[in-house]
């Protein structure tokens, strides 16, 4: 099923698989979202939950409050990006997707949760709202959440990657940890100014 929001400026499509964006086209038909060429990266815009990035050996070790010496296996970027979400169209400019913890997720991440993702289309802007609802009464749940959209670059055949740049409205003063792309792990002690 094609899930779509459309206005005069953009046509945006979504997938129940991962509750994610699958296409962003302007009024001229230019595709802005990466279309998942597996030669480079098969993803498009996965939702990352309950982790962003990687864990050493994919192991999540939970404290005694959860289960004594319990270890779960959480792959890079979490448990939901390759799961089917329930879809609900709210109105002509808003769709939502929902995923509820199940037997499979509870084996690796011992928390009951509902993850709602709400997408809104306004002019040439798409906003994403994440809602993590805990069903846990006695404890809070640890998590990270994030979006990982891939964008086409270059957009036109006569352009090259080097024609593009990012411009920030403010000078950036943070430092970033050294990363190891093969594992997705970070060295928090070795930082580079950004």
Which residues are covered by each model-predicted region?
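Broad, structure-driven detector of short, well-ordered beta-strand segments within folded domains
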Residues: 11-14, 117-119, 166
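Active-site/ligand-binding surface loops and adjacent short beta/alpha elements
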Residues: 140, 150-194
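Extended, loop-rich substrate-binding clefts of extracytoplasmic carbohydrate-active enzymes
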Residues: 70-123
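Residues that act as N-cap/strand-start positions at coil-to-secondary-structure junctions
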Residues: 6-8, 18, 54, 79-82, ...
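Acidic, contiguous internal or C-terminal segments within carbohydrate-active enzymes
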Residues: 5, 101-149
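Beta-strand-rich N-terminal accessory domains
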Residues: 1-61, 66
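Hydrophobic residues embedded in beta-strands of well-ordered beta-sheets
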Residues: 3, 22, 95, 126-128
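Short, hydrophobic/aromatic beta-strand segments
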Residues: 23-25, 139-145, 177
């Amino acid at each position: 099923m094609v899930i779509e929001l459309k206005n005069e400026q953009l046509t945006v499509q979504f997938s129940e698989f991962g509750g994610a964006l699958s296409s962003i086209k302007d009024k001229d038909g230019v595709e802005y979202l990466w279309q998942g060429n597996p030669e480079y990266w098969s993803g498009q815009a996965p939702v990352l939950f309950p982790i962003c990035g990687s864990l050493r050996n994919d192991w999540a070790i939970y404290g005694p409050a959860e289960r004594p010496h319990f270890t779960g296996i959480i792959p890079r970027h979490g448990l939901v990006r390759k799961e089917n979400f329930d879809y609900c169209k709210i109105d002509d400019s808003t769709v939502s997707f929902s995923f509820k913890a199940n037997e499979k997720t509870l084996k690796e991440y011992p928390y009951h949760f509902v993850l709602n993702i709400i997408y809104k289309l306004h002019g040439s802007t798409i906003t994403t709202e994440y809602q993590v609802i805990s069903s846990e009464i006695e404890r809070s749940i640890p998590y990270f959440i994030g979006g990982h959209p891939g964008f086409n670059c270059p957009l036109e055949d006569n352009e090259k990657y080097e024609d593009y740049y990012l411009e920030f409205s403010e000078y950036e003063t943070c430092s970033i940890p050294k990363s190891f792309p093969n594992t997705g792990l970070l060295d928090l002690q070795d930082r580079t100014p950004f």
